[in-house]
Amino acid sequence: GHVRQRDGQIQMFGRDMSRARPHEVSRLGVAYVPEGRGVFPNLSVRENLVMAARRGRDGRDDWPLQRVLQTFPRLQERFDHLGAQLSGGEQQMLSIGRALMTHPALIILDEATEGLAPQVVAEIWRVIGEIRRDGIATLIVDRDYRRVLAQADQALVLQKGQVVLSGAANDVAANAA
């Protein structure tokens, strides 16, 4: 589910999104990679990816199926396997791939590397860098603040639900040390 905000405003593309429904947020180009993967267990890798495919809100088609499969070769190898048959790392690759198939303007990654093997973690962070280089805005929620700060332009640090640091990633990194 979604948590309702208590105060303030959420703006995207100059529009107040505070009361927007999930499908409205998605239509504006927001893709969400949830903590816990969120793949469809009874659908194949192919079906999970193809069902998400659509052009971006600006007509972009930067992440077609072939590019997702080149980015995550393991998904190509497991193309006809069900989501439930994949390892945790493969499921996370599938979840990110599915989000990219929507050609988002913004991708939200919630604990994208939690519980994954170190080599998969490195692969996910490599792909996050590629996503950013493509000009897709990323919002990363992760406990590994050093990796986040290495990727980020701006950072916000929460402690017990309160903002304790915010600003340019370099400034936040200097203050977090």
Regions found by a protein language model. Name each.
Residues G8-R15, L28, D61-W63, G167:
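Conserved ABC transporter NBD signature motif
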Residues A20-P22, V45-L65, T71-Q76, D80, ...:
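ABC-type ATPase nucleotide-binding domains, specifically the catalytic core motifs of the NBD
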Residues L82-L86, E90:
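Conserved ABC ATPase signature
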Residues A99-L100:
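ABC ATPase C-loop
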Residues H103:
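Conserved catalytic motifs of ABC-family nucleotide-binding domains
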Residues I107-E111:
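Catalytic Walker B motif of ABC-type/P-loop ATPase nucleotide-binding domains
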Residues D142-R143:
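H-loop/switch region of ABC-family ATPase nucleotide-binding domains
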